[in-house]
Amino acid sequence: MTDSHYIGRFAPSPSGELHFGSLIAALGSYLQARAQRGIWRVRIEDIDPPREVPGAAATILRQLEHYGLHWDGEVLWQSQRHEAYREALAWLHEQGLSYYCTCPRSRIQRLGGIYDGHCRTLCHGPENAAVRIKQQHPVMHFHDALRGDIQADPQLASEDFIIHRRDGLFAYNLAVVVDDHFQGVTEIVRGADLIEPTVRQLSLYKQFGWRAPGYVHLPLALNEQGAKLSKQNHAPALATGDPRPVLVQALRFLGQRDVVAWQEMSVEELLRFAVTHWRLTAVPTSANVNPAFSNASR
C-alpha cells in the first residue's frame, strides 16, 4: 500500500543484460520512490528491434527480482503501445504541430548536426519521410532535483526534432513522453547521459498540453577508460550470485549511509535499510571511475 501520489519508473531497453551502471539507475529510482511511499513501475522500451537482444527483456526482469527490486503493477511494453504512439502522431499532425521531412542524414551532418527546418513549409507527403515536431515551445532550461537549474544548448532546444523515423520506427522522445504521461509518472530518476534529451521531452509535454514530471539525473558509473558503463562497450552483466555486496557497492556509489552489518541482513532487510536512510542530497553529481565497477558482476 502507498499513501503518496509519487510515481516513479525504471525503463530499460532490452539491448542486453543489466550491468552495474543500469543498477545505479534502477536502485536510485526505486529508493526515491519507496522513500516517499510511492509507486515504482517498470517499462521495457522495446521499440527499436534492430538494437534488441533476444531474451534480454526476460533476463532484465529476472535480474531486477534477484536484486530485490520488485515493481508495482504490470510491466508496460512499448512494443504493445504502437496504437497510442500513432494516435499521438495523428493529433500533432491535425494540430499543425508536425511535418514530414525528406532531408537525408548527410545534409544534416553538413549543417553540423542541427536541423535547420528546411522541410517545414514544403508540404511533403509521408512517402520515404520522417516526421518532425514543429517546435512551438522550446525549453531553454529545467530544474533537476539533484543538480539544480540546467541550461540547454539553445540550438538543440529550438530544433524541430524527429518523432517518427523514416524507417517507420517511433522515436524515443515521442514514446517516452506518451508512456510517462500514460503511466502517471510524477518524477523521472535516470542517468545523467539523458540530460540532453530532457528539454526535447519537456517541449513535447508543452505541445500536448500535459503536465510534465520532475527530473533527477544520477551520476554515471564509468569504466577504467573513463567511458560510461554500457551494453555497447561490453560492461559485464550483474552477478547471478549473492546480490548484497553489489547492492552495497551501488549504495556507496550513490553516496548513501554505509550498511555496516549487511552480511547479517537479507536482501529485503538491506533494501528496507536503504529506503529508510535514503537521502537524495547525499548523491554526488559527478561521474565516478572505479575499477570495481567493471568487476561488479564477477
UniProtKB/Swiss-Prot annotation:
Signal peptide: none annotated. The keyword Zinc applies. A motif ('HIGH' region) lies at residues 12-22. InterPro entries: Glu-Q_tRNA(Asp)_Synthase, Glu/Gln-tRNA-synth, Glu/Gln-tRNA-synth_Ib_cat-dom, GluQ/Sye, Rossmann-like_a/b/a_fold. Transmembrane segments: none annotated. It is an enzyme of class 6 (ligase). One of its GO terms (biological process) is glutamyl-tRNA aminoacylation. Zn(2+) binds at residues 101, 103, 115, 119. The keyword Calcium does not apply. ATP binds at residue 231. L-glutamate binds at residues 9-13, 45, 172, 190. Its EC number is 6.1.1.-. Belongs to the class-I aminoacyl-tRNA synthetase family. GluQ subfamily. NCBIfam families: PRK05710.1-1, PRK05710.1-3, queuosine_YadB. This is Glutamyl-Q tRNA(Asp) synthetase. It comes from Salmonella paratyphi A (strain AKU_12601). The gene is gluQ.
